[in-house]
């Protein structure tokens, strides 16, 4: 896998009036960012309301995004607190040949270094060919990564 370089813009999740994910408009927005010069996008980060989008709608988007001409230019955020759901979602994404992920430690509970390391270790052991960007957003997850 090549090293990620460049600007990866956070994408918005476009919602329908019933608050369901508008898959087509969300993908159009992401592709527009690339057309405008970004090297890639981060889908389902905090700007993309990842914590609020149902897994089934995320999977619907991934199925359609897997056919995009820019497929290899997207980081896929998980936005899930459950380790098992994170791994299962990543396995679905991996089956569609998405390999780059943006993963924040679980939110709400206070975690120490050993618990966060264990969280990422289990993900890597379950999906060894994935490339992970550590999502360092202390305000949202309550954990601050150290340089060690």
PLM regions and their residue ranges:
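Active-site beta->alpha loop and helix N-cap motifs at the rims of alpha/beta catalytic domains
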Residues: 2-144
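Short, intrinsically disordered, charge-balanced linker/junction segments flanking boundaries
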Residues: 146-148
